[in-house]
Amino acid sequence: SSLVGSEMCIRDSSYAIVAEKYISPTSELPSHLSIHDYLLGRGRNQKVVIHTHPIELVAMTHNAAFLGRDVLSRLLWSMIPETRAFCPKGVGIVPYALPGSIELADATIAQLDDYDVVLWEKHGALGVGENVIEPFDMIDTLSKSAQIYMSGRAMGFTPAGMSDAQMQQLKEAFNL
């Protein structure tokens, strides 16, 4: 059968159809294609773009105190050592922009040279990698750190996190 309008189907690496029916592309398609174009244009080996909506990370973008440059990176890194290891460049923040817009894509691209993962304020997270595991692990580990922070807050305390000295020791030990 042939596709109609803006419909598309999902195929695996051998071009076999893996979706049972044709599906419409996501409203985020322009952003994703712009990001792929950027990665290809820079000669980067990252071929995978993952966009998801991790509840705890999105919730944290609703707090203006976390939106300053590197504030959230520092906080999340301090919760568990794995976060710094999986996301050594940290997390960038893109102020709210209309989902699927070119403005959102451009703002995301501006963050990708400096950060491993980009959070879209009040929306979601985006990571890139050479394979699907890389961005998944980064976002998953950031989400775990956010869960630890929020669990502590829910129990009535603010988690202390690792000290600056502990974070520096981790950075040096793992060449981060």
Q: How should each PLM-predicted stretch be described?
A:
Residues 6-7, 11-176:
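Glycine-rich flexible loops
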Residues 1-5:
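Extracellular interaction modules
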